[in-house]
Amino acid sequence: MGSGEIKNNEILNFIIERSLFTSKQFDVILKRRRGEPSVEHRSRGAYYRLLKQSRDKLYGLIYSILLLQIAGLFDEQTKNVLDRLSKQVAVTQLSDVEEWVARDVIRVMDEVIRRMSKV
């Protein structure tokens, strides 16, 4: 989605719910990447615990992707499909999306990812 503003919409919420990250962890990662102020409505200790959890998950995720590539389960076609999905979701970030459009995008995205994850 690039470095622009990320809108919290139905599609993004769906993706976060099914990801390995909580919405708070995603928020911390995003703000750190952008260089935005870090501690907001939480103690410094809680923030740094959340940051460590987020980093650990990201670290593990990158190793998992590497492992899947080595095993041939994350090939070029899979990368291309994920890239197209990412670009389509990025388009929904440019303007307000009607509820029926969001549901359709979510349905298609979920179906594609389910097919890709069959082992």
Q: Can you say where each PLM-predicted feature lies in the sequence?
A:
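Amphipathic alpha-helical binding modules
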Residues: K87-V119
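Short, Lys/Arg-enriched N-terminal segment that forms or immediately precedes the first helix
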Residues: G2-R18
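Short alpha-helical "packing" element that flanks the helix-turn-helix/winged-helix DNA-binding module
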Residues: K24-R32
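Charged, amphipathic alpha-helical oligomerization/scaffolding segments
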Residues: Q53, N80, R84, V108-E111
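Helix-turn-helix DNA-binding module
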Residues: K31-S43
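Intrinsically disordered, low-complexity basic tails/linkers immediately adjacent to helix-turn-helix/homeobox/MYB/SANT
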Residues: S64-L94
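C-terminal flanking helix
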Residues: R55-I62, L66
